Amino acid sequence: MTNFYKVFLAVFILVCCNISQAAVSFIGSTENDVGPSLGSYSRTHAMDNLPFVYDTRNKIGYQNANVWHISKGFCVGLDGKVDLPVVGSLDGQSIYGLTEEVGLLIWMGDTKYSRGTAMSGNSWENVFSGWCVGANTASTQGLSVRVTPVILKRNSSARYSVQKTSIGSIRMRPYNGSSAGSVQTTVNFSLNPFTLNDTVTSCRLLTPSAVNVSLAAISAGQLPSSGDEVVAGTTSLKLQCDAGVTVWATLTDATTPSNRSDILTLTGASTATGVGLRIYKNTDSTPLKFGPDSPVKGNENQWQLSTGTETSPSVRLYVKYVNTGEGINPGTVNGISTFTFSYQ
């Protein structure tokens, strides 16, 4: 009986010691630089086309296929996190702030740039779902970070300089029973300094900057009911534009800048009551609404004046009297509207 137990114990120890354990080791660097040092990039775009995604024509990024060595069935995925402040979004992807004028779009993921995940927010997120190496094989797990600058705001020098800046981190995520133990799991990234040389295109106004439209004299009987309209005057605006510029415009009520309706406020010099002014463009049947005095892309009540294929765009404007429904008292009618062009 004693000999039987000795044989059994010896076999058990032999089987135990041949069990394989999934393995991982860190072979990369904990601190990594993204992009070439002192990179310089040049682009041309319409002045107010902001935020402008600055295609640098080549990748600003970091790739390394050999960050962790894995073997014996080890399963690994990747998580990524950006530490820069979120200052906006573009098509659902966060724009991260570098300076007041320059931001970044960031992708993190596996070794191939094409598989990178568009980053949003400042929390850890899955950027590579993962895989498991074969039980009897060995391989490596890599990673990549890619960025694209975004111009957020114009400056007078048309030159934007960015200093070396910490971006965030990627960490290895073991799963399916795999464990990293004491192995380094997190690597950090910093963006190398770079310069953007920005050339902007725009338009020149050919029409005088101050246009006076003489309004025709009418009788109250021509506006019998609330909402009735009569053409009061007309004018045109003409511009000369660089190629590729799409012109947008915003009308602002100079007397009441907060006005967002389609009826222009009469100035204090007006003596008529119960009548307002509407402005139409070209052959439109809907009057233009008033918005803030701003060239910002997407400004409230901004409307398109031309396409990027027109280098000599123009617009015909019609001013119409409108019965506001408050009872018309004859008198003088004066209104002031400003135009703000946005070159996109």
Swiss-Prot record:
Chain intervals for the UniProt region annotation (Fimbrillin-binding domain): 200-344
InterPro entries, per the entry: Adhesion_dom_fimbrial, Adhesion_dom_fimbrial_sf, Adhesion_dom_sf, Bact_Fimbrial_Adh_Pro, Fimbrial_adhesin_lectin_dom
Disulfide pairings: C75-C132
Protein's UniProt keywords contain Lyase: no
Protein name, as recorded: F17a-G fimbrial adhesin
Domain of life: Bacteria
Chain residue ranges for the region called Receptor-binding lectin domain: 23-199
Keywords carried by this UniProt record: Disulfide bond, Fimbrium, Lectin, Signal, Virulence
Places the protein is found: Fimbrium
Signal peptide: 1-22
GO annotations of cellular component type: pilus
Amino acid composition bias (Polar residues), ranges on this chain: 299-308
Record family assignment: Belongs to the fimbrial protein family.
Residues covered by region (Disordered): 288-308
Binding of a carbohydrate, residues: A65, N66, D110, T111, S139, T140, Q141, G142
GO MF term list: carbohydrate binding
Annotated Pfam families: Fim-adh_lectin, Fimbrial
Gene Ontology biological process terms from the UniProt entry: adhesion of symbiont to host; cell adhesion involved in single-species biofilm formation
Purpose of the protein: Essential fimbrial adhesion factor that mediates binding to N-acetylglucosamine-containing receptors in the host intestinal microvilli, leading to colonization of the intestinal tissue, and diarrhea or septicemia. Also confers adhesiveness to laminin and basement membranes.
